[in-house]
Each structure stands twice: as C-alpha cells, then as structure tokens.
C-alpha cells in the first residue's frame, strides 16, 4: 500500500515530533517514522513504587523562548516546573547535582 504525504519525519524523538508538529501547523500531511517501540527518543519515564522517574533528558533552559512557546502551543505550559520552586537533581558522574533554577522540567 502506498501513501503520499507532504512530509516524512525520520525519528520520533523530541526534535522529530517538533518538526512534525510544525509541519502539521502549516497544513502538511505528516508521517513520523520511528524505529523504537514508542515515540519520545531519549525522553522516558519509569515508575518505581508509584513514583515517576525520568530516565532521559527532560529539562531545557527557560531562556530558550522557542521551547517554552512550543510547550504552550501543545497545551503543556501548565506542566512546566522550575527547580527554583522545588528541588530537582540529576545523577551525574557518580553524584547528585542540583539543577540550575533557569531550567524548566
């Protein structure tokens, strides 16, 4: 079966999904080609004892306005959390390290 599309995005990670969203916003018929079992790329969450643990990259700098704008366009603006309003750490090089307050999770 052959399907014609305006835009084929290879990879369902955050960049691929953002590209697909941008194409759809322009009215393109879009298909996302993902080799893995789920979209998200490096963004993954595991649940241990009922607590969600982020397994991959899930933070970005709030000083990048395009990232914040994209989250708002997708209806995720209310889900953004700043480490300044809580405590957020990342495990790196064998130690817990506090995330800078200008990042959003």
What are these regions (language model features)?
Residues 49-105:
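Dinucleotide-binding Rossmann-like beta1-alpha1 core, especially the glycine-rich loop
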Residues 16-17:
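N-terminal Rossmann-fold NAD(P) dinucleotide-binding loop
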Residues 8-10, 24-49:
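Glycine-rich FAD pyrophosphate-binding loop
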Residues 2-7:
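Extreme N-terminal starter segment of soluble prokaryotic enzymes
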């Amino acid at each position: 079966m052959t399907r014609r599309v305006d835009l084929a995005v290879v990879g369902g990670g955050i960049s691929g999904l953002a590209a697909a969203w941008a194409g759809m916003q322009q009215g393109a018929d879009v298909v996302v080609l993902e080799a893995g079992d789920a979209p998200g790329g490096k963004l993954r969450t595991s649940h241990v004892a009922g607590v969600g643990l982020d397994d991959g990259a899930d933070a970005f700098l709030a000083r990048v306005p395009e990232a914040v704008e994209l989250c708002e366009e997708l209806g995720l603006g209310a889900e953004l959390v700043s480490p300044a309003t809580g405590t957020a750490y990342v495990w790196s090089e064998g130690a817990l390290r506090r995330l800078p307050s200008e990042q959003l999770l």
